[in-house]
């Protein structure tokens, strides 16, 4: 879906149920979602975005632990590290930039939040809420 299959099928007037290319970025790009939360003041963990391992490691030298390091791409439920120290964090950054989970152009480093994770999926016609 992140490649736009829903958009393509809709252009062919084929009925399809799913998010369009832009909406699917909420699932496909962790960084897209973090920036969206930031833009609309949706509470989220503090974070940094890094395009290379050097800048990521510099940031990690002054961060608190544990932290969370994520590859910014679809990684089949993988590509997320909870790191307890600098050594684990450096290893996570290396593995992500070395392509362990596909070609990630960026790495997301965020504070670790303790608690239960919750996800919601909501289906709407765009105006009706029941």
Identify the residue ranges that each predicted region occupies.
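Conserved ATP-binding module of the ATP-grasp superfamily
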Residues: 43-45, 66-68, 83-119, 123
